[in-house]
Regions:
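The right-handed parallel beta-helix/beta-solenoid scaffold, focusing on the short coil/turn
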Residues: 66, 104, 115, 122-124, ...
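Right-handed parallel beta-helix/beta-spiral solenoid domain characteristic of secreted/periplasmic
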Residues: 124-180, 185, 205, 216-218
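Glycine-centric low-complexity/flexibility signal
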Residues: 178-184, 202-385, 403-461, 482-508
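Right-handed parallel beta-helix
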Residues: 128, 164-174, 193-205, 246, ...
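C-terminal motif of bacterial Sec signal peptides marking the signal peptidase cleavage site
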Residues: 21-24
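N-terminal extracellular ligand-recognition/capping segment immediately after the signal peptide
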Residues: 100-138, 152, 403
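Bacterial signal peptide processing site
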Residues: 26-29
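Right-handed parallel beta-helix/beta-solenoid
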Residues: 31-91
Length: 510
């Protein structure tokens, strides 16, 4: 990994500092580490230089009147002074925000602050990694002020009104993501001039996107068609009726059976949705028998969902990847056609004396099964991002940006299997010498739901930015360490999600 150092500048500055010290301009410890004097540093936007008495060094700490003091080991009743520091960064930031713009300095002791911090006041300067037991001087290199938060939380969010914020000697660490598709993001900066000096921003590994389990049950099956009325009955040979089956916005219903009259026999009605095969059965004609209703056709399968593509979105809340598209719902099976009816007879010998002389009704067609639900698309994998910059101006000096691994996209889910079609109703019974009515047709099987597409893989990024200006390149005050991007989630029939990106800086402008 390439690393950038201000080596030659530092040697020249130390020589200059020694000469200036001899003239009594400022103490040597002020120049022993960069404090905004080397190239590429200084207050963003050309603010006035910082007062030497307020800048901690190796030999001397800041003056007590310079700002707010905070230590994680302090008691709960601190007032922000050197003697009684606050014990949370949030309290120190609130206190600093109420001071004059040139007095908004915060001095933080070595230690780990576990809190989610939002910094929204312009002009804040935070000096970390100070040895509180040594008059708030700069601590040794291996002793740091660290800011962390819980899983799936962004430890530090900086929101400005176009003003500047300066952080020095801080280590901001985002924990590995915990929820499915979660991201790990160390810092978000929005509309601010942000200067980072001797800081490390470290994001943990992101989480893989969720893959839904396949459906355990088929879609709702069809309903059996009603039976036709028997011959010689008071029901006048009525055909069977099928109750409609509602499948979301679709409806499937079997055709009504034909009606049996004394001298004629009706034809069954076609099922719905109408197709090529679910016609109604023919009623009895002379010596020819009636016919059963035609079977309903299979419902159309739902279209598969496409795999997720695109970079996703970055906002103050973090990162949101692109999920795979859901598959479309299958269409219901066609209802079976109604069965044809049979004729009655006027002869008293065929039906009871003085009773009805109707023929037998045809059975209703069975309804089709409902179409299967579409498979859910795979969830996008989370991203590991050291710094999100939203329309912010960034300046770095001896900064390390660390990103972990992006999460893999979730797999697309198989669509639900369509419901089975139902049997048609039976034709009505008839006494000897008359024909029974004919049965209704079988309902069609519901179409399968379309399979879901795979989710996008997450990114591994040092800087994710949106809006101007474009952030500096690696070597301009910072080095970067990156993990591997997440793989796209598998879809079906090649509809995989896109693989994530591994980049020093990646723009998300549309």
């Amino acid at each position: 990994m390439r690393r950038f150092h201000w080596a030659s500048g530092a040697l020249a500055l130390m020589s200059l500092a020694a000469g200036l010290q001899a003239l009594g301009c400022f103490p040597l410890d002020y120049t022993e580490r960069d404090h905004g004097v080397t190239p590429g540093s200084g207050s963003a936007g050309g603010e006035a230089p910082r007062e030497p008495r307020c800048v901690p060094g190796l030999q001397e700490g800041p003056d007590a009147s310079c700002g707010i003091f905070v230590s994680v080991e302090a008691g709960p009743r601190g007032d922000g002074s050197k003697e009684r520091p606050f014990n949370t960064l949030a309290a120190a930031i609130d206190a600093a925000a109420g001071r004059e713009p040139d007095q908004r300095r915060i001095y933080a002791c070595v230690g780990t602050f576990m809190e989610k911090v939002v910094l929204s006041a312009d002009g804040i300067e935070v000096y970390g990694s100070l040895a509180c037991d040594q008059e708030w001087r700069l601590a040794e290199e291996d002793r740091r002020t660290t800011l962390g938060a819980g899983p799936d939380e962004i430890p530090l969010t900086i929101v400005g009104g176009g003003g500047s914020t300066r952080l020095e000697g801080l280590e901001v660490v985002a924990r590995p993501a915990a929820r499915p598709g979660g991201s790990s993001i160390a810092v978000v900066a929005e509309k601010v001039k942000l200067e980072l000096v001797r800081c490390t921003l470290q994001a943990g590994d992101a989480k893989h996107g969720e893959s839904s389990d396949n459906y355990e049950m088929d879609a709702q099956p069809g309903r059996v068609g009603g039976d036709g009325a028997p011959a010689c009955s008071a029901l006048s040979g009525a055909g069977g009726i099928s109750d409609p089956l509602e499948c979301d916005e679709d409806v499937t219903v079997g055709g009504i059976g034909g009606q049996g009259a004394p001298a004629t026999a009706g034809q069954g009605n076609p099922g719905s949705p109408e197709g090529a095969t679910n016609t109604g059965g023919i009623g009895q004609r002379a010596a020819a028998f009636c016919s059963v209703g035609g079977p309903g056709g299979r419902g159309q399968d739902g279209a598969p969902g496409e795999g997720g593509v695109g970079l996703g979105q970055i906002t103050r809340s973090g990162y949101k990847g692109v999920d795979g598209a859901n598959g479309a719902r299958g269409r219901p099976g066609e209802g079976g056609g109604g069965g044809g009816a049979s004729r009655g007879r006027f002869e008293a010998a065929r039906c009871p004396a003085m009773g009805p002389t109707s023929g037998a009704g045809g059975g209703a067609g069975g309804t089709g099964g409902c179409g299967g639900l579409g498979g859910r698309g795979g969830q996008a994998g989370g991203s590991s991002i050291a710094l999100i910059s939203l329309a912010s101006e960034l300046r770095f000096q001896e900064v390390t940006l660390v990103a972990g691994k992006g999460g893999n996209g979730g797999a697309g889910q198989h669509g639900q299997i369509g419901g089975a079609g139902a049997e048609g109703g039976k034709g009505g019974d008839a006494p000897d010498g008359l024909q029974d009515g004919c049965a209704g047709g079988m309902g069609g099987h519901g179409g399968a739901g379309g399979d879901g597409g795979g989710g996008t893989g997450g990114h591994s990024l040092a800087i994710a930015f949106k809006g101007m200006p474009v952030p500096p390149s690696e070597g301009q005050g910072f080095t970067a360490e990156l993990g591997e991007p997440g793989a796209g989630g598998p879809g079906f029939q090649g509809r995989d999600g896109a693989t994530g990106n591994r980049a020093i800086a990646l723009g998300f402008d549309e």
